[in-house]
Amino acid sequence: MKVKVLSLLVPALLVAGAANAAEIYNKDGNKLDLFGKVDGLHYFSDDKGSDGDQTYMRIGFKGETQVNDQLTGYGQWEYQIQGNQTEGSNDSWTRVAFAGLKFADAGSFDYGRNYGVTYDVTSWTDVLPEFGGDTYGADNFMQQRGNGYATYRNTDFFGLVDGLDFALQYQGKNGSVSGENTNGRSLLNQNGDGYGGSLTYAIGEGFSVGGAITTSKRTADQNNTANARLYGNGDRATVYTGGLKYDANNIYLAAQYSQTYNATRFGTSNGSNPSTSYGFANKAQNFEVVAQYQFDFGLRPSVAYLQSKGKDISNGYGASYGDQDIVKYVDVGATYYFNKNMSTYVDYKINLLDKNDFTRDAGINTDDIVALGLVYQF
């Protein structure tokens, strides 16, 4: 019986962190769920910047209220607290915080810190035990979590076509000190006004296909030609993404390809020790593919390949790195689920990047990393 229960629970746990939430309140059309996890995590690597304790915890809530038979209000908040720092470091941040209204089959609208519509497709490959999703990041235009998202979502195309979902999104300018870190918003985390949309279709028999397009204005800091360390220049940051997914019969296969213009970043621009070079590739080709299998007794092995190839990486002073790999690795890992609340995993990132002038100047790690984690979630 335990084996059968695990085979049903594990796929649900992989959908979202809140899938395993604890119901706190459910009465008179009002519902509140609490969710969270503690990840006792350690990295082993020759890279001193990666090696060591990486323990963290996340906690959040999801709530909804039934206004009437056609209108529902909802909200969600999620927070991350690092457990590998001293008590006075205050190293924590808000991952998401938004509120919205759902109008029956007419769709939903929400505003706040949320996920960009590009992630509607790229999330399909962001399922590795620890690593993954490296070809983009938080506060990276409209590619993942960010501030000031106004999002309209429609499920099953107004209730007329099962599995056909679409979203339209606008993001306001973020150039001030905010975002998902305690160091403020560096130019690599800034964005101008942006908009985009996504379309996904669950074809049936476990197959899904999707695509997304976003375009954002770039800020003055991001186009500051007087900064010799800054690479990449352009009025807009544009992303085109397509993906495929198969999720059935204990098999999970997914792939996504993105082509970006002035949007794929590298290096570090904030803090007291920025990298020698940082900025955005004028063009980048990003590819992620993953394969997993869920055994009935709780084991889920995983293998993946990720690559981000930057094209024409140059600055306003005539310096150029040409075409360079920003991310390139094979990932082999496995997760074992003791039950719906407890799991452990190992994830081996086999780095395929070579040390060269670009990786050294941008501070990009070229060493392998092995991650070991023990997770309690609710």
Swiss-Prot record:
Domain of life: Bacteria
Keyword Hydrolase: no
InterPro entries, per database record: Gram-neg_bact_OMP, Porin_dom_sf, Porin_gammaproteobac, Porin_Gram-ve, Porin_Gram-ve_CS
Pfam families hit by this protein: Porin_1
GO BP term, pick one: monoatomic ion transmembrane transport
Record's subcellular location: Cell outer membrane
Cysteine pairings via disulfide bonds: none
Key words, A-Z: Cell outer membrane, Ion transport, Membrane, Porin, Signal, Transmembrane, Transmembrane beta strand, Transport
Gene Ontology molecular-function annotations: porin activity
GO cellular component, one term: cell outer membrane
Main localization category: membrane
NCBIfam families assigned to the protein according to its UniProt record, in alphabetical order: PRK10554.1
Record-stated family: Belongs to the Gram-negative porin family.
Name recorded for this polypeptide: Outer membrane porin C
Organism: Salmonella typhi
Record gene name: ompC
